[in-house]
Amino acid sequence: MARAFLVVMDSVGIGGAPDAAHYFNGDVPDTGANTLGHIRAACDAGQANDGRSGALQLPNLARLGLWHAEALAVGEPVPDHPAHGQWGVATEVSRGKDTPTGHWELAGLPVPWDWTYFPDTNPSFPVEISNAVQVAAGTDGILGNCHASGTRIIAELGEAHMRTGWPICYTSADSVFQIAAHEESFGLKRLYQLCETMAPMLHDMHVGRIIARPFIGQPGAFERTVNRKDYAVQPPGPIVMDWVKDAGGHVYGVGKIGDIFSMQGIDEVHKGSDADLMKHLSNLVDGAKDGSLTFANFVEFDSLFGHRRDVAGYARHLEWFDAAIGQLFDR
């Protein structure tokens, strides 16, 4: 019996959707978005030579039809050489550009409501949310309360967090409420409990995810860990994982898939860094059950390189992924 493997390269976009002008990063609309194409152009221009050099090399993904799909998405002529895989592009019908929206649609369930987004102001959160965090955390206040990059706000407020014990709360252009805390001084279990306590209130407001963002280290050398955990709204209807299970199949989640879908329809989850996830995926290629679905998300494109606008790092990760996934194709 056949098996299916659905692999998401998180944030690796190949062109803006028709409604891109309705979405923003700060004051800049998403019109003309094309993460992959822009990284390739930067590589061609010699602007991504840190730890690598030259043109972007993705032979295995290209063989599947990656550049054919990218050309179609941005309205350019597709390459003359044939692809050896089936390729295409899709446009979301839901309103939103965040993780739950995209993944739910991949799983067959458009989002039936508009998500709640917090304004890019200071403070960003209503008083009732800030007060609820303080009560749940047992603190006299919170830090942040704004739009921010996770790595930057941890660098800026991590020392104050360790001194006061106040959680760092922030958001972004997505429908998220993120809480960062030090794994040792605040406690990882305590951070998870805080997020679990806040999740029902925020989910009722149609905030898509509450994200625990643990970090370690000392001032000047803070580092986020792989112990991130997402508390997402439960899908309001059946998804492809449910259909697989109804047919008697087994569903494997790799990466943050379990968190994104609140474990709906998922039998087991394998987590870790992207390097760990590739090993898990390799093992599942060898050992996943007949009739099963493996749904994987490789998040470090976004978390380590996209948010930081690290073009060279993103290109390195793309080339690493291409080489690693190519070994699986050969099996």
Regions found by a protein language model. Name each.
Residues S11-G165, Y170-H182, F186, R213, ...:
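Active-site nucleophile/metal-coordination loop of metallo-enzymes that catalyze phosphate/sulfate
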Residues P18-A20, A180, M263-I266, F305-V311:
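Short acidic, glycine/proline-rich loop/turn micro-motifs
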Residues G165-I168, V207-I210, L281-D302:
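Active-site regions of oxyanion-processing enzymes, predominantly non-cytosolic
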Residues S282, D302-R331:
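A long, amphipathic alpha-helix that forms part
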Residues G253-L281:
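Functional beta-strand-loop-alpha-helix junction segments that form "active/interaction loops"
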